[in-house]
Amino acid sequence: MSLLHQARFFTTVNHLRDLPATAVPEVAFAGRSNAGKSTAINILCNQKRLAFSSRTPGRTQHINYFTVAPVKAPDPIAFLVDLPGYGYAEVSGSAKYHWQGLLSDYVQTRSQLSGLILMMDARRPFTDLDCQMVEWFLPTGKPVHVLLTKADKLTNSENAKALRETRKMLEGYAEQLATPVPLTAQLFSSLKRRGIEEAQRVIAGWLSLPEAQAAAPAEQPAAPGASE
């Protein structure tokens, strides 16, 4: 069983000064307000109500932390970080400014951040705001793994095209970097439970969870991103 299944809520943060003062690794989840981010987090952690999604897209404007650790462990060994969804037009200007600043500052400056899970609707990958998120994060030299969510909405050929185009975009970003960084992508469907184990392997590897260390002799570190 994945240790992610034992994730539990830790804290909510509205300012960078309130981020947990810990040294444990973090994996952040980012995406547009309607990309299915909260649902995907719940599925990956095998829980129904770990991450809450507002009925009104764009309402959640805080950073939510979830601790990853065995149930009786006194301290977390890692964190999952649910970032505010972006791109919803009805958010007020002042709230949007604060929100964008919180997002950009966190992904660019948080030293504990080990990697970014970027969720995009498979029907509309790489919107302008998705590109902005990638461009904020790339200079950190840390990996990005794209989950093309709602893959159940597309045919097999449409999914193949979306994945191919996403990987091509990521290759373009990789060419801009002086030092190679893993920029990978996969198809994902919460409804059909597609791609769950692959995404869990990526996250476990970034967080150095015991399950990833146990699997290391059998598979190479780059394998999780190599889905077809």
From Swiss-Prot:
Q: Which cofactor does it need?
A: Mg(2+)
Per UniProt, what is one GO molecular function of this protein?
Answer: metal ion binding
Superkingdom of the source species: Bacteria
rRNA-binding among keywords: no
Instruction: Identify the Pfam families for this entry.
Output: MMR_HSR1 (PF01926)
- EngB-type G domain residues are 23-209
**Which residues hold Mg(2+)?**
38, 60
Q: Which Gene3D superfamilies match?
A: P-loop containing nucleotide triphosphate hydrolases (3.40.50.300)
Cellular component, GO, one term:
cytosol
Keyword list (alphabetical) reads: Cell cycle, Cell division, GTP-binding, Magnesium, Metal-binding, Nucleotide-binding, Septation
Q: What are the recorded Gene Ontology BP terms?
A: division septum assembly
Q: Where along this sequence does the record place binding of GTP?
A: 31-38, 58-62, 82-85, 149-152, 183-190
Supply the InterPro entries for this chain. G_ENGB_dom, GTP-bd, GTP-bd_ribosome_bio_YsxC, P-loop_NTPase
Q: What does this protein do?
A: Necessary for normal cell division and for the maintenance of normal septation.
PANTHER family, alphabetized: ENGB-TYPE G DOMAIN-CONTAINING PROTEIN (PTHR11649:SF13), MSS1/TRME-RELATED GTP-BINDING PROTEIN (PTHR11649)
Which family does the record claim for this protein?
Answer: Belongs to the TRAFAC class TrmE-Era-EngA-EngB-Septin-like GTPase superfamily. EngB GTPase family.
Record protein name field:
Probable GTP-binding protein EngB
Q: What is the lineage of its organism?
A: Bacteria, Pseudomonadati, Pseudomonadota, Betaproteobacteria, Burkholderiales
